[in-house]
Amino acid sequence: MDPQNKSPKPQVKSTRLVVKKQPAGVVFPKLSIPVNDFEKTVTLTRAQKKEAKLLKKAQRKANKLNNKQDSTFFNSASGETNNTILPPGVKNQADNKTNRFSKFISFFTSSKNKQPDEITERLVDDPTVKNRFSAFNKKLIWVLKDKKLRARAWKIVGYTNLVIVAFFAGLLAVMNKFITLSSVEYPAIALQLPINNALWGISIFVISIVTLPFWTMFILFLMGVKDVRTSRSIHYFIWIVLIINVVLLLVSCLLMIAAYAHLDGYNIWRNLESLNPNN
């Protein structure tokens, strides 16, 4: 066969497939190029296959992001929300579950016990504290942080409780004697028997609850709880009991004034002489 009669083989120009990365969230068509006026699929090289895998991986990540809500989180330190850049098609909506959980955790986490160096540091308003605590709570936090203010608060509590205990201990002794007096010899006291019984019961109640916070502190100390004196819960308990006792002290004074204001000095002295055990 004559070699000159051989038909020459068609020369195919070498084409190079260039795959460009597309942004996430875009569906890519099949990769194909025309060869010799025919539509044929091109066999990819190793580098091109690796690049195609990376594109598919990016596509899967974009699909996952499309099924999720906006990835925002609650910053407990500053109280602000940080938004991330989302792929197209994803709505910018707040993650309510994450925000609720973060607020729940940040509400119960206590702030660091930092000793204020200056008065101005205690007067700076913290936006997170402003939203969560009232003015009384913020004042109590400042008092517990400052050693001088904390010592002054303990002195006020101690002296007030001593006055309350002394008042109601004397009132209990007097009322315990008054409720046993004869109505014939002491008619003025016998006429006020309901008030005397009420004052007697109030005295017992106040004396029984005035030491309850301190017993609680002692039990917590034995259980190994540290810094019981600086606990906000303990101070709430102490001040609530103290306010109740002060209110009952005022009520007792009003009851005694209403019961014995009509008596003159001689009758009051005569009634008080009944406390003498020699009589």
Swiss-Prot record:
Its main location: membrane. Residues 70-85 have a biased composition (Polar residues). It is a multi-pass membrane protein. One of its GO terms (cellular component) is plasma membrane. Keywords: Cell membrane, Membrane, Transmembrane, Transmembrane helix. It is found in: Cell membrane. NCBIfam families: MPN157. The keyword Cell membrane applies. This is Uncharacterized protein MG144. Residues 60-92 are annotated as: Disordered. The lineage of its organism: Bacteria, Bacillati, Mycoplasmatota, Mycoplasmoidales, Mycoplasmoidaceae. The keyword Iron does not apply.
